[in-house]
């Protein structure tokens, strides 16, 4: 291709070139050539080849000290064009697909539909300004890169949080059934054995994985299997449907085909099998009874006790619910502020809502880990940022500042330091400060002052900040308080009153404390004394749980009374500055005397008159969001929980000039609160809390249980491997350093909270049911026995059940034989007693889960090996290395031999496997009962929801002027 050939030629020319002028000439020619090339028509493969050549050329030019910025910019432009072209192509393909489906409106139809409406969503966000994570907190607005600040407007989705609700009829039985014939052994050696009447048995397939997964211990296997079973269990305690059919033996009755009962009925209805007559007789009385009045259903099932136990666990430990009707009424009362809320439909008496499931385990983990706490607080702030109504600013303050300069008779022709007095005042600072103040009402934070601290505007802003901010020691650090006081003193008081500038030193860090009794103007002294009171904010709403949400605080400033202490203090302070500057020929280091006095008078009017709208705006937002305080995301103050952890608080950056910018910037009333959005937000938080609680508590419960069973296992590693993060906050747990996470999971209070969770109780109950199922089910065919009896001399084979010819299984432990447990022998306990029994050639019983070596009766090699090991049990079970260590080093396998096929006359294996000295202890096979178990469950539709707002209809009823509850306008011009 022409472009590739051209670039290869240039690369070869560069290798031969040595003069810098020639390099520059080649660079300029290449830029000019690239400008005329249409890169959109180039294939992807060739474009990649071109990029490689360009990189080689650019590296060569840079090594020759040639500035390659124009060439790189040109190449970047071509890449952007190609990207845009690809996006357009994809969108065009999507449009083509949509157009093919005529039933769906196209994107153009939607655009045309809303084009005439005043609020067009397709043109509202035309201006897209680059946003960064949590810029409300951390953007330095004094830097040029972010001089224009636009808050995030996109909705924070709490998807993909989906709550799956399953009713009891979705339960799949874990124990299958099978039909097996009885073996009738022949008493005559010349006659073969025969099959007798069949019987229906419970299988033990659910223990198929016990050999492969129980290598670390049977208890760990139970916990892992219980954790998997918990995820499969239904989480609603009722039935919504039932698979029924006519009883074939009694047309007046019905039978239940759910819960695996259809397979049983198919087996029983084999009328050629006369051995099942008793079961068919009992089946006539099976029936399903539905009580529509009480909404219950009764039906008959024949299930394994393990399945019945799991059903009881799923019903007893179903997900906690709450009645929907009271919550709907609460939502309707909340939304009565400017809205009329009505129910869309009449609610059923069984209509339920997922209960607020707030994880105390997660709260405790946040208390133990500072990074996790801050991550969760930032996530909550970002979620709440879209609720504030802060659209109250003009586009720019330049005109306002120009008017102030003109009124102060500051000449704009001679640019000097005077014009920089208010240079840091801008809308970006106002936005950031307002968001910080609103966040400080709900979250306790530490302040981090940024920006210039040596200008007139910053000093005026600090003077207002000392009135608005909470200056008590619990909410404001002494360092921040000293910085604000010193700035006000040095930039406003010291020059105006002709006093020496304050310099910090040991023992004297605060200018106000140093000079409050130094004979200053009375008005100035009153302000300083008022500031030194260090007044806190007022509590507006008290939290129900300080470990979940902090109290809601608001500035301690009156909304209506202009004679409130704060307004009077600011007014008298500025009057005192003006009065002091009258006697001083040089009242400011950078502003002339006349200009300074006029500037101060303008500032007095602005600060005193426009501070009240700021307070009203803050109260307007906080009052409404504070109403749903108990529905808000996590906002606890770690200082309330542990006084030693104040340093773990989040640090909010506030521009030093932000308060004056805020006072000057508010020009209009805020938008009305959208209660539909706020209540939808409450629903989203409920779902998020539920998903976080399930994720954290499930994985933490498994970690604690596995550690209880085996102290060598790491709780931290199990937790990280099992957790499935639904939110970024839970995902941040995986970023905690390893040693820190280990220390967190060593906290006794956290472990006790985990043991008290719903997840822990469910998993423990399932594990107990699994243990009982193991103890009472035959598991020898799956490779694990309950124990073994070792005889010194071979004994005759037995017959443990009527379904086998012979086997070496015992269903009961023989009496009068010394017993040992595997765990004791592994620890070295009673090992000498075991050796004494062997030396005395006495039989022994080894209790505990024992791995088995299963021999197939049809293979001569396996039978021969089994004959050798089963007739020398001591040599096979005790290893010489065990004698040296005086303990059992590993679990030893013992032989299991089952012959369950009818034998021909004169079977050759009878002579080989005639006797054995090894017997396996196991449970008997479970027969499906003839008479059924009768179950009774609630029976109604799935009336459980995770959203309240979808049952509510919103009607706007706004007054002409936006008002507070006490009837005061937010802003009066």
UniProtKB/Swiss-Prot annotation:
Homodecamer; each decamer is made up of two conformers of VP2, called VP2A and VP2B. Interacts with a VP1-VP3 complex. Interacts with the intermediate capsid protein VP6. Interacts with NSP5. Interacts (via N-terminus) with NSP2. This is Inner capsid protein VP2. One of its GO terms (cellular component) is viral nucleocapsid. Keywords: Capsid protein, Inner capsid protein, RNA-binding, T=2 icosahedral capsid protein, Virion. InterPro entries: Rotavirus_VP2. It comes from Rotavirus X (isolate RVX/Human/Bangladesh/NADRV-B219/2002/GXP[X]) (RV ADRV-N). It is found in: Virion. Belongs to the rotavirus VP2 family. It comes from the Viruses. The keyword RNA-binding applies. Inner capsid protein that self-assembles to form an icosahedral capsid with a T=2 symmetry, which consists of 120 copies of VP2, with channels at each of its five-fold vertices. This capsid constitutes the innermost concentric layer of the viral mature particle. It encapsidates the polymerase VP1, the capping enzyme VP3 and the genomic dsRNA, thereby defining the core. GO terms for molecular function: RNA binding.
